[in-house]
Amino acid sequence: MSDNEDNFDGDDFDDVEEDEGLDDLENAEEEGQENVEILPSGERPQANQKRITTPYMTKYERARVLGTRALQIAMCAPVMVELEGETDPLLIAMKELKARKIPIIIRRYLPDGSYEDWGVDELIISD
């Protein structure tokens, strides 16, 4: 037994004060997030008479769609494109996005509390 292992019975953690700065960090992360929600394509989108948001997919929406779809593929969701030896879920998700076959609806919230639903196939994707 070494000199450093004398009194480690797990009670030492009770003496540590909680850091109050963590709450500020969590709030800052929440404020920085874009007002976007990812919906499964089974849910019917809201019928929009006139859309006011941009028809371009933002880099944040692209990242979230690719991450969500890659997670679904990793959990054995059916793949919507033909595979040519790809095994990486992220590469498969990128291939699906390029083919506009991702079954996800993006919900964009507006400042007045309303929202617009956009299918991935409706958005203009810049590479």
UniProtKB/Swiss-Prot annotation:
GO terms for molecular function: DNA binding; DNA-directed RNA polymerase activity. Pfam families: RNA_pol_Rpb6. Gene3D superfamilies: 3.90.940.10. SMART domains: RNA_pol_Rpb6 (SM01409). GO terms for cellular component: fibrillar center; nucleus; RNA polymerase I complex; RNA polymerase II, core complex; RNA polymerase III complex. InterPro entries: DNA-dir_RNA_polK_14-18kDa_CS, Pol_omega/Rpo6/RPB6, RPB6, RPB6/omega-like_sf, Rpo6/Rpb6. It comes from the Eukaryota. It is found in: Nucleus; Nucleus, Nucleolus. The keyword Metal-binding does not apply. Residues 1-53 are annotated as: Disordered. One of its GO terms (biological process) is transcription by RNA polymerase I. DNA-dependent RNA polymerase catalyzes the transcription of DNA into RNA using the four ribonucleoside triphosphates as substrates. Common component of RNA polymerases I, II, and III which synthesize ribosomal RNA precursors, mRNA precursors and many functional non-coding RNAs, and small RNAs, such as 5S rRNA and tRNAs, respectively. Pol II is the central component of the basal RNA polymerase II transcription machinery. Pols are composed of mobile elements that move relative to each other. Belongs to the archaeal Rpo6/eukaryotic RPB6 RNA polymerase subunit family. NCBIfam families: PRK01099.1-3. This is DNA-directed RNA polymerases I, II, and III subunit RPABC2. It comes from Rattus norvegicus. The gene is Polr2f.
